[in-house]
Amino acid sequence: MVIMKKMKDSVLFLVVGLFSLSVLVSQSIAGRVKAPLLQSNTGGLVFSKSFNSIYDTSMYGRLQLNNGLARTPQMGWNSWNFFACNINETVIKETADALVSSGLADLGYIHVNIDDCWSNLLRDSEGQLVPHPETFPSGIKLLADYVHSKGLKLGIYSDAGVFTCEVHPGSLFHEVDDADIFASWGVDYLKYDNCFNLGIKPIERYPPMRDALNATGRSIFYSLCEWGVDDPALWAKEVGNSWRTTDDINDTWASMTTIADLNNKWAAYAGPGGWNDPDMLEIGNGGMTYEEYRGHFSIWALMKAPLLIGCDVRNMTAETLEILSNKEIIAVNQDPLGVQGRKIQANGENDCQQVWSGPLSGDRMVVALWNRCSEPATITASWDMIGLESTISVSVRDLWQHKDVTENTSGSFEAQVDAHDCHMYVLTPQTVSHSDV
C-alpha cells in the first residue's frame, strides 16, 4: 500500500519448438519436478546456441499450492490505485458490470479484487473478520454471488501482519479462521500484504496462509504482496501464485520504468503456476501520456506480469479502453509457453534505447522496441541479440498497428520509435514448419 508505507515493521543448447506445457505444469504444481520450462526439439533450425542462456528458466521451482491456478498470469481489476479506501459494494458491483459491458471480461479480465478498507476496524466477539457495515452492508457473500453471476471472480485483501496497511484487522495468527471465512463467502482470490508484520520474516509469515487456503478445499488464487523486500522470487514459488517483486507503483513515468527494470531481474523465476508481480496497471489514471501507457502495457504483457487494471473502468476514455483491450498484446501475456520476456539490450544515453524480447509458443518471438529517450530514436533488434539463428527469415507483425510489417526479414529488424513510446512485434519463422501449443 502507498499511504501506510512508513508503518512497516521490516520491511533456457536449443529450445522452444513444441512444448509439453500441460504435463510440465501439472507435475510442477504437484511438486514432482524441478526443470526448465522450455524443452528442445526444434533441431536447431530457428534458435541460436545462446538462446538457452538468454532466456534462462532453470531457476523456476516447485509449487506447493496444489490449487491448479495461474497457468497464465492473472487478469482483472483492483480497487486500490484509483479508489484507495473510498470503496463500497456499489463500486464493486458497477465495476463488475463495466468489465462485462466494455468487453474486457471477454478478453480475460475476470478478477474483481477488493483491496484494503473493506472490513470493519475490529473483529467480532468470536474473532471473525466483519465487512464494514456502512460500505459493505450486504456482506461479502452476497457481493461474491453478484460478481459470480456476471461470470467473474471476486478477490479480497488481507495482510500478513496484525493490521492491514490502513489499520484494519490483519490475518497474522488468524490464518485458518480467515481462510475459512473467505472460502465460505465464495472468495476466489486473496491479495496478502506486508504491513505491521512484527518484524517476522516474510518466509515465515506467508506459508501459513498458503496452508490454510489449501485446507479450505476451495481454489483461491494466492497473491503475495511482500513488496520484494526479501527477494520473494527466490522462495515464493513454493508459497503463492504470484509475488510482488517491487515497492508500490505510482502513476508516473519514473515509477513505471523503475519498476519494470526491477522486475526484469527475476525473469528466470517465473512460469506457469507462479508469476513475478511488478504491481498493478496505472493505465487510465492520468499521470502518463498515451505513448507511455502503451509502453506500460506492452512491457507488463511481455514480462508475463499480472494484468490488473487500476483505473475506474466505469469511466474509461476511448484511449484507455483501446490499450487495455489490445487482443494481440493480451495474447502475448497469456501465451501458454509462459516464459517471461526480458530486457535484452539497452543503448543510448542512460540506456534509453531498449530491446525487450521473449519466446512464445510455436517457435515465435515477441520483441518490444522501447524508446525511453526524450527524442525519437531508431532501435534495432538483431537476430544474434534475441537468440535467433542469423539465417532464419521471419514475418513481422506489429501488435499496435494490427498489421503485418514484412513477410520475409532476416538478420535484424529496426523501427523509428517516438520518445517514450513502445513498438511491439511478433516474429514468426518462415522456413520451419511448426504448430502452436
UniProtKB/Swiss-Prot annotation:
Kindly list the positions annotated as binding substrate.
115-116, 191, 226-230, 244, 248
Glycosylation is annotated at 88, 214, 250, 315, 408
Protein name according to UniProt:
Alpha-galactosidase 3
Q: Which GO terms describe its cellular component?
A: apoplast; plant-type vacuole; secretory vesicle; vacuole
Leader sequence range is: 1-30
Question: What is the primary gene name for this protein?
Answer: AGAL3
| Record-level GO BP terms | carbohydrate metabolic process; cell wall organization
Its family remark reads:
Belongs to the glycosyl hydrolase 27 family.
Question: What Gene3D superfamilies does this protein map onto?
Answer: Aldolase class I, Golgi alpha-mannosidase II
InterPro entries documented for this protein: Aldolase_TIM (IPR013785), Glyco_hydro_27 (IPR002241), Glyco_hydro_27/36_CS (IPR000111), Glyco_hydro_b (IPR013780), Glycoside_hydrolase_SF (IPR017853), Melibiase_C (IPR041233)
Induction context:
May be processed or degraded in a VPEgamma-dependent manner in vacuoles.
Q: Which UniProt keywords apply?
A: Apoplast, Cell wall, Cell wall biogenesis/degradation, Disulfide bond, Glycoprotein, Glycosidase, Hydrolase, Secreted, Signal, Vacuole
Q: Which PROSITE patterns match?
A: ALPHA_GALACTOSIDASE (PS00512)
Q: What does the record give as the function of this protein?
A: May regulate leaf (and possibly other organ) development by functioning in cell wall loosening and cell wall expansion.
Q: Which organism is it from?
A: Arabidopsis thaliana
Reactions the enzyme catalyzes: Hydrolysis of terminal, non-reducing alpha-D-galactose residues in alpha-D-galactosides, including galactose oligosaccharides, galactomannans and galactolipids
Query: Which cysteines are disulphide-bonded?
Result: 85-117, 165-195
Which domain of life does the UniProt lineage start with? Eukaryota
**Organism lineage:** Eukaryota, Viridiplantae, Streptophyta, Embryophyta, Tracheophyta
Where is this gene product found? Secreted, Cell wall; Secreted, Extracellular space, Apoplast; Vacuole
Q: What residues sit in the active site?
A: 193 (nucleophile), 248 (proton donor)
GO molecular function terms attached to this record: alpha-galactosidase activity
Which CDD domains does the entry mention? Answer: GH27
Q: Which SUPFAM superfamilies match?
A: (Trans)glycosidases, Glycosyl hydrolase domain
Concerning Pfam families, the annotation shows: Melibiase_2, Melibiase_C
* EC number(s) on file: 3.2.1.22
What is the main EC category here? hydrolase
Record bears the keyword Cell wall biogenesis/degradation? yes
